UniProtKB/Swiss-Prot annotation:
Organism, scientific name: Pectobacterium carotovorum subsp. carotovorum (strain PC1)
Top-level taxonomic group: Bacteria
Catalytic reaction list: 5-O-(1-carboxyvinyl)-3-phosphoshikimate = chorismate + phosphate
Binding site for NADP(+): 48, 54
GO cellular component assignments: cytosol
Subunit structure as annotated in this protein's UniProt entry: Homotetramer.
Record-given protein name: Chorismate synthase
Keyword terms, alphabetized: Amino-acid biosynthesis, Aromatic amino acid biosynthesis, FAD, Flavoprotein, FMN, Lyase, NADP
Matches recorded under HAMAP family: Chorismate_synth (MF_00300)
Positions of FMN binding: 125-127, 238-239, 278, 293-297, 319
GO molecular function: chorismate synthase activity; FMN binding
Single GO BP term: amino acid biosynthetic process
NCBIfam families documented for this protein: aroC, PRK05382.1
Pathway: Metabolic intermediate biosynthesis; chorismate biosynthesis; chorismate from D-erythrose 4-phosphate and phosphoenolpyruvate: step 7/7
Length: 361
């Protein structure tokens, strides 16, 4: 009802605000006997962590995760896993000026309309700070998927503004602060970020995420289609305004003879569908893309109103990302992993005894 949970068999519930004491989550449905330590979660948290480069917010949070429950002697017990991350670098005074003013493009106005009040410190519950817990939970899912099924989930930045980044080299993604797989575009990205910082403005981005070695058969008919659940999960990430599966909106200009993924005894000849047919995984790579809007927390003055409905002007102070898409890469990976683990457990529960004789590649 309150919208703080996702998943059925693998269920993640988060809590906490940007400037509260801590962030946390409860992860239900993890099978027993899975080796798990805080170090397993910390790697992805460090990839998402703020203050790690000059291209992201300079809020410096260590994001050290604590496992509170559900793990004993280094393995999961099958009970609820409790995770906690303390907030240590809040500067709430940066937000005192917006206590009675709505930042244009943010959730200030809509939260006030829904609840009749709001935590104005850094956006409260609507802040992307909440996604730290998704990344922690997603790291559990990623480890399970890799260990039990050989599934690898990884993402990359595919576009910032007009600068597109081709998937040339996965190894490059972890070698630069942009999560960019195209080393030839790093200079252009750096120049764009410097220009935005000088202008006090921001820019949108596109992130791509790929899951390899996903078994065929995941997904439920009609309302719990795998692509529907992936779109739901990815759209729930802050600032995301659009999600594509496979070729997405590009299929509008394609002919059926071009778009269909033909099959031969050697396997599928293309993957326009992004690894999902009829809402069920085909065994191909699952591919999704998400578009993130430019943050509205910028130094460029903008028109807005106060709580009394009076016109005023807003210039956002504080520490903010010029492009929120950069740190969205590990978040997108986490959300895809959470959905895939949930559907793998659902498939195992209902169809674990199914042994199809149809070839798989």
């Amino acid at each position: 009802m309150a919208g703080n949970s996702i998943g059925q068999f693998f269920r993640v519930t988060t809590f906490g605000e940007s400037h509260g004491i801590a962030l946390g989550c409860i992860v239900d449905g993890v099978p027993p006997g899975i080796p798990l330590t805080e170090a397993d979660l910390q790697h992805d948290l460090d990839r998402r962590r703020p203050g790690t480069s000059r291209y992201t917010t300079q809020r410096r949070e260590p994001d050290q995760v604590k496992i509170l429950s559900g793990v004993f002697e280094g393995v999961t017990t099958g009970t609820s896993i409790g995770l906690l991350i303390e907030n240590t670098d809040q500067r709430s005074q940066d937000y005192s000026a917006i206590k009675d003013v709505f930042r244009p493009g943010h959730a200030d106005y809509t939260y006030e309309q829904k609840y009749g009040l709001r935590d104005y410190r850094g956006g409260g519950r609507s802040s992307a700070r909440e996604t730290a817990m998704r990344v922690a939970a997603g790291a559990i899912a990623k480890k399970y998927l890799q260990q039990q099924y050989g599934v690898k989930v990884r993402g990359y930045l595919s576009q910032i503004g007009d600068v597109t980044c081709e998937l040339k080299d996965w190894d490059q993604v972890e070698q630069n602060p942009f999560f960019c797989p195209d080393v030839d575009k790093l200079e252009a990205l750096d120049e764009l970020m410097r220009a935005l910082k000088k202008e006090g403005d921001s820019i949108g981005a596109k992130v791509s995420v790929v899951a390899e070695s996903v078994p065929a058969g995941l997904g439920e008919p009609v309302f719990d289609r795998l692509d529907a659940d992936l779109a739901h999960a990815l759209m729930s990430i802050n600032a995301v305004k659009g999600v594509e599966i496979g070729d997405g909106f590009a299929v509008v200009t394609k002919r059926g003879s071009e778009n269909r993924d033909e099959i031969t005894p050697d396997g599928f000849q293309s993957n326009h569908a992004g690894g999902i047919l009829g809402g069920i995984s085909s065994g191909q790579h699952i591919v999704a893309h998400l578009a993130l809007k430019p943050t509205s927390s910028i130094m460029v003055p903008g028109k807005t109103i106060n709580r009394q409905g009076e016109a005023t002007e807003m210039v956002t102070r504080g520490r903010h990302d010029p492009c929120v898409g950069i740190r969205a890469v590990p978040i997108a990976e986490a959300m895809m992993a959470i959905v895939l683990m949930d559907h793998l457990l659902r498939q195992r529960a209902q169809c674990g005894d199914v042994n199809s004789q149809v070839p798989r590649w």
